[in-house]
Amino acid sequence: MPRATALGALVSLLLLLPLPRGAGGLGERPDATADYSELDGEEGTEQQLEHYHDPCKAAVFWGDIALDEDDLKLFHIDKARDWTKQTVGATGHSTGGLEEQASESSPDTTAMDTGTKEAGKDGRENTTLLHSPGTLHAAAKTFSPRVRRATTSRTERIWPGGVIPYVIGGNFTGSQRAIFKQAMRHWEKHTCVTFIERTDEESFIVFSYRTCGCCSYVGRRGGGPQAISIGKNCDKFGIVAHELGHVVGFWHEHTRPDRDQHVTIIRENIQPGQEYNFLKMEAGEVSSLGETYDFDSIMHYARNTFSRGVFLDTILPRQDDNGVRPTIGQRVRLSQGDIAQARKLYKCPACGETLQDTTGNFSAPGFPNGYPSYSHCVWRISVTPGEKIVLNFTSMDLFKSRLCWYDYVEVRDGYWRKAPLLGRFCGDKIPEPLVSTDSRLWVEFRSSSNILGKGFFAAYEATCGGDMNKDAGQIQSPNYPDDYRPSKECVWRITVSEGFHVGLTFQAFEIERHDSCAYDYLEVRDGPTEESALIGHFCGYEKPEDVKSSSNRLWMKFVSDGSINKAGFAANFFKEVDECSWPDHGGCEHRCVNTLGSYKCACDPGYELAADKKMCEVACGGFITKLNGTITSPGWPKEYPTNKNCVWQVVAPAQYRISLQFEVFELEGNDVCKYDFVEVRSGLSPDAKLHGRFCGSETPEVITSQSNNMRVEFKSDNTVSKRGFRAHFFSDKDECAKDNGGCQHECVNTFGSYLCRCRNGYWLHENGHDCKEAGCAHKISSVEGTLASPNWPDKYPSRRECTWNISSTAGHRVKLTFNEFEIEQHQECAYDHLEMYDGPDSLAPILGRFCGSKKPDPTVASGSSMFLRFYSDASVQRKGFQAVHSTECGGRLKAEVQTKELYSHAQFGDNNYPSEARCDWVIVAEDGYGVELTFRTFEVEEEADCGYDYMEAYDGYDSSAPRLGRFCGSGPLEEIYSAGDSLMIRFRTDDTINKKGFHARYTSTKFQDALHMKK
């Protein structure tokens, strides 16, 4: 989020904020030695965050800044008085940058409609901005921490030594991880802040996909891990860099006490309920560290942040001397002001820098003309993990003293001044080359004597590969997360403690693809040398499976050629123990199976794991070869037990098909069947063709396998249990499997028999098998399907006239898309041709007459019917055409006195509405009449603010008209009437849960009648 460059934004408010003590419902302070390895998995991340300083559990939010109860006490905010409930759909937590404001202004989204989502039981998000108590009262313009200024007494909010340990949650992709690392390297490059992978540090940040969008606390919270939320649409470089600004200790720039001298807040343009985001801090309680107001700060809001409309300003910069208004809200890079503030906040040395290139050099200030007295410089050399740094001093002339007490250059093997010392140097003797054990070096120069020398000059080079003799670490391709360099060859020899194995897991993988990995590749071998057994030769974009060596050594080689370069790879290695080799075999009753980082127990055939995951009990499921029988959930007819996994494999004779009919069905579950479920597949393997995953209380339809095998799997979780299910299976011979059942065209298997069908343009002979040429008038009422010219795919016959009358569900337009088209060519299509009409017959307006070999563009009717007529003359014949008919929702509807129907989707009644639906209907009545809309059925995914799926009604022709309401759940409680002659209906769905939809009826009505009925 933007920052208050103020020291109170950075020091008084940052350093004065007390440490949280269980604020926001957090758990007890975790042990400093706690193991957070669970963060490698998504579920582990979410569970561990229950015990974190979680910004999504903050008392309130100030923009994307999380404030806890102690912050409120510091600001003297009485929640009951100063905070009010959120009353409108919130925009959600964004950083207020330019790119976000642009992305939030899609054509069909109003300023009041946008929102982020908060997770429910199924991990989905719900639209909300603030947790209770809500937003700051709009009347409040400033707030003040009325405590004595203590710039140095609250250092617990500053990260010690500028070192910020981090963990990246396991639910992020490789590209997202790369963005996080690029943003951290950006901060390191321009400041003296350092980000390190967390080992055993007590306080650290966790990149997590949280429910509150983009948000973070300001500064170090202390007492354990704290989350930095990178939620939906937050995984952009500038947004992550902005959030890291909060972690470093920055508030929003526009909240500085002196902001009114530089910008104007236009309050009438601010979305209702968002006024608190524009509060400012009080002068006298904060300090700006001597830095001027920074329009260019990455911590500044954009001009239209939280605006009622995209083109309305909420923050207007004042004109400069040339009459130009500065640009604000950039999310591209740190500004010079950001850099200066951070360097002051963390007391960065006046000289020195962070060096991140593969090669580079640096020297003492003034070299070779002499360095000044009392100089202090620090160079932080940081290359890609898995690389080492070779440092060479080529010139050395420093005042020499005993133990190099006065003037010296010091090199440490790590990221800070507490790292192991490689050497302290003075005098004129050039040191031997120094080599780091990892990817960082700390070089510090100090002078305190009055006798000065020329100084020193040093050059460094990153070398990839080498020996990695430790129990855990990280290896990345050179220059990761940026593209690796050409013509590289890196060899790593990993050795962990005796008695352990080497475990290797990949976080990201993107190496130039080739079928045999001939160009760029990563090679992994099970041992210490190139002659060791090959584990894998990897390239492409899929992460390799986890690797486990058979000894305590592993050999890796990365090679790139001279051309195409990709992002490369990032991998973690660690010591791995085989728990199954222990005397008790891990406590497993039957079999122990070692896994990377852990182990699991398994049971012999006919048994399954008990609830303790170690003991075995008689299994449910089994291998069934009977032609018919019954399958029930374990414990039937009582409730099934928790943590069960049952698999039935049903096998019938060849040429048979298996049908499964559920008689009783009652499982825990919601629409996504995440908890308890039954899966049915055609085949015996767990990845065979899936017919469906079922849960809840709705009985599935009869399922028929595609072969003579069927797999039925039942799973229950560790919580709610229900009655379960009872199903009957029966096998039937598939007469179509041999010689197509004797059918000339298509054979369709039915239970106990079969039937023949004919292709388009033919009808079934009375013998039930042969097909004869049929008449050519077709009526089509299916939602989608294929139609073709007669005799397709062969040439159409001469002297034929065929018609197709296509009708669709009320409120849905017919769409026709041609896959192939070849009809005798004529300039005016006078011979053979296809005509399309916008209605039910040839009296409707014509949409076009077509011939030749150019496919007509996809055509959409204005209503729910389309008429086609194909004509061929006596001479030339061609291949003809094939087209797909489908439907599109929305359009213009005419309201009349006679009642008409409107359905949410074309398959209403047969299937739930589809995901990502975008439908707008405009219903228009005659002059002097209004529109009356009543709902016969309404079942749309329910959410407090209708932020997922919803139906909206507007009193006019488009969304600029007054909105009559947004509805979800069970819908409107009464009829909807327009005040004018038109009504717009908008239907939107998201990408997950789908419901039945709605069925509405509309008619025209006199205005006075409608008003009377409303009364």
From Swiss-Prot:
Q: List the disulfide bonds.
A: C192-C348, C212-C234, C214-C215, C351-C377, C404-C426, C464-C490, C517-C539, C580-C592, C588-C601, C603-C616, C620-C646, C673-C695, C736-C747, C743-C756, C758-C771, C776-C802, C829-C851, C889-C919, C946-C968
User: Which cofactor is essential here?
Assistant: Zn(2+)
User: What is annotated as the active site?
Assistant: E243
User: What are the Peptidase M12A domain coordinates in residue numbering?
Assistant: 149-349
Q: Which CDD domains does the entry link to?
A: CUB, EGF_CA, ZnMc_BMP1_TLD
Q: Which ranges are annotated Basic and acidic residues under compositional bias? A: 115-125
Q: Where does Zn(2+) bind?
A: H242, H246, H252
Where do transmembrane segments lie in this chain?
none
| Glycosylation (residues) | N171, N361, N392, N628, N805
Give the range the annotation lists for the signal sequence: 1-25
What is the name of this protein? Tolloid-like protein 2
Q: Which organism is it from?
A: Homo sapiens (Human)
